[in-house]
Amino acid sequence: MTNRVDHPAGGYKKLFESTEELVAPVTAQVTGRIPVWLSGSLLRCGPGLFEVGSEQFYHLFDGQALLHKFEFKGGHVIYHRRFIRTDTYVRAMTEKRIVITEFGTFAFPDPCKNIFSRFLSYFQGLEVTDNALVNVYPVGEDYYACTETNYITKINPETLETVKKVDLCNYVSINGVTAHPHIEHDGTVYNIGNCFGKHFAFAYNIVKIPPLQADKEDPINKAKVVVQFPCSERFKPSYVHSFGLTPNYIVFVEQPVKINLFKFLSSWSIWGANYMDCFESHETMGVWMHVAEKHTGEYLNIKYRTSAFNLFHHINTYEDHGFLIVDLCCWKGFEFVYNYLYLANLRENWEEVKRSAEKPPQPEVRRYVLPLDIHKVDTGKNLVNLPYTTATAVLRSDETIWLEPEVLFSGPRQAFEFPQINYKKHGGKDYTYAYGVGLNHFVPDRLSKLNVKTKETWVWQEPDTYPSEPIFVSQPDAIEEDDGVVLSVVISPGEGQKPAFLLILNAKDMSEIARAEVDSNIPVTFHGMFKKA
């Protein structure tokens, strides 16, 4: 997994090229044999348009949302894609310019307005983007594409048509939610986002959306806040991209990447800024971990602390004999990793990409162990007595518990990211295997399987190919955890190859079973899901 491959041809730049949606689905060219039991659709979200008219988007998370679908039918694969008709997209296409500010791109006022109208537009309230480019997930019988604001977009998973925009602020107290909700077996949805808590201070709310009931009412109408976590700084909430969930507990990791509320409100309304302009790093905070009981909503007033890291993706969290095991894809340090994900950086030639990747926090897969019972223990002693981990938790004299992790994978500028597991059977439970994209200086150039118990790895990699997040699909008659396949969208810009393909791997050993090639480039996709037929 740590074997380094160079990319002097710069084929990875094709990940960040605009494309067009398809008028109609196309049949992919299959080599190999697709398992007969594999029936359903892989849905993926990502940016598909990196400029509007003469105006460029600047950040990886700015491009207009493109929804992809690979449908498996009787050994064939049908590919389709459509732009999501968000308000952001429709207005941009109508006005032929960037109309709503994105994560790293400020939308300038309409140049056709006079100077007085443009001045007033700064004070007419913040227009929040609904550009749903990050993920897609089910709620009841419906499917929603999402970003990380208060807006989610209902889509038709069969036709990829956009159905409607939903503002979650109309249902719960939330400023925005993550693109990584947890979905339980019965369809219950849990998510987290920041909110205004007591005394106008920021807090973090856990939102619960129940499964579809016999009355067939939209489950979102019944959404409610079930847990509230405190914020370490009153007016500076941390950036949160995911969280941990077990059958009995919710885990929230508060990282030192902060949103400065005053900067957010003043800069946006007075001189114009984007979301990235409002982040700042807290150099001395480290990381705070919070735990709450899932069923009662009780916040456990245990002060877990550790050294600084960036966190975007939880791998899995589970309970074991009075401990919570929390496995994370970490980036070591307090500086915001997203500072290095501007498109100009990602499109550089290979040597410059490598130089740039030397600067940000470096990646590491870590296991933290959080003790839940800390009564009658001695200060200064390690509270972790599980035989299979070297992670420690030490009670300090100030009543904080200092956590040191066990490192499950580490390689210089070699990340294991966009993790997936056999979620249906092992989400929130003890598990053995995780699947991820291998990032080589931020360039995705391999797919990896990690045994979190032995640290053994398996890798799929081909020259000049760039895969996406691996999605695990279990066999219907699976006995073992890794009985199934791994799906990934891969671009292949090399000569003599089709521009892109859907890769199907044996989840046991990461060997190729089949691929389904298409005749058009597929830009980078972030997250998605497999919808069974």
UniProtKB/Swiss-Prot annotation:
Coiled coil: none annotated. It is a lipid-anchor. Its EC number is 3.1.1.64, 5.3.3.22. Palmitoylation by LRAT regulates ligand binding specificity; the palmitoylated form (membrane form) specifically binds all-trans-retinyl-palmitate, while the soluble unpalmitoylated form binds all-trans-retinol (vitamin A). One of its GO terms (cellular component) is endoplasmic reticulum membrane. Its cofactor is Fe(2+). Fe cation binds at residues 180, 241, 313, 527. The modification N-acetylthreonine is found at residue 2. It catalyses: an all-trans-retinyl ester + H2O = 11-cis-retinol + a fatty acid + H(+); lutein = (3R,3'S)-zeaxanthin; all-trans-retinyl hexadecanoate + H2O = 11-cis-retinol + hexadecanoate + H(+). Binds 1 Fe(2+) ion per subunit. Retinal pigment epithelium and single cone cells but not in isolated rods. Keywords: Acetylation, Cell membrane, Cytoplasm, Endoplasmic reticulum, Hydrolase, Iron, Isomerase, Lipid metabolism, Lipoprotein, Membrane, Metal-binding, Microsome, Palmitate, Phosphoprotein, Sensory transduction, Vision. GO terms for molecular function: all-trans-retinyl-ester hydrolase, 11-cis retinol forming activity; all-trans-retinyl-palmitate hydrolase, 11-cis retinol forming activity; beta-carotene 15,15'-dioxygenase activity; cardiolipin binding; isomerase activity; metal ion binding; phosphatidylcholine binding; phosphatidylserine binding. One of its GO terms (biological process) is retinoid metabolic process. It comes from the Eukaryota. InterPro entries: Carotenoid_Oase (IPR004294). Its main location: cytoplasm. It is found in: Cytoplasm; Cell membrane; Microsome membrane. A lipid is attached at residues 112, 231, 329-330 (S-palmitoyl cysteine). Critical isomerohydrolase in the retinoid cycle involved in regeneration of 11-cis-retinal, the chromophore of rod and cone opsins. Catalyzes the cleavage and isomerization of all-trans-retinyl fatty acid esters to 11-cis-retinol which is further oxidized by 11-cis retinol dehydrogenase to 11-cis-retinal for use as visual chromophore. Essential for the production of 11-cis retinal for both rod and cone photoreceptors. Also capable of catalyzing the isomerization of lutein to meso-zeaxanthin an eye-specific carotenoid. PANTHER family: BETA-CAROTENE DIOXYGENASE, RETINOID ISOMEROHYDROLASE. Belongs to the carotenoid oxygenase family. This is Retinoid isomerohydrolase. It comes from Ambystoma tigrinum (Eastern tiger salamander). The gene is RPE65.
